[in-house]
Amino acid sequence: MAEALGEGAAEAGAEVRLRRVPELAPRAAIESNPGWREYVDEVAPSTPEATLDDLSWADGYAFGTPSRFGTPAAQLKQFIHTTGRLWQSGAFVDRPVTSFTSSANAHGGQESTILALNNVFTTGAR
């Protein structure tokens, strides 16, 4: 989904940086799930980790997350929690933001995940 969104933005003339947030889970947890292990070992290394400099650089943002029991993934929440310095400086003022999510099943909490993530954006506005 992130790649499709990035491609669409680029086709519309935007300069795009596709990033991922750092993994927080212990290796044992990752190893216990073949799909997760494949992502961490084979897919993730091809996408740079997001930094605060990426957020400073961007004129707008699109945040994506899997739905985890109706909330954004802990990895994304933790990254957002590191942005206090930028928020305090007013770096996010007048920058548009959107979000997207997915889950493995219908009624998997997508609506509440988007609401929880978007609450960060609206309550963090100055």
Language-model features: locations:
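N-terminal beta1-alpha1-beta2 submodule of the flavodoxin-like/Rossmannoid cofactor-binding fold
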Residues: 1-88
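Short, glycine-/small-residue-rich phosphate/pyrophosphate-handling segment
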Residues: 93-126
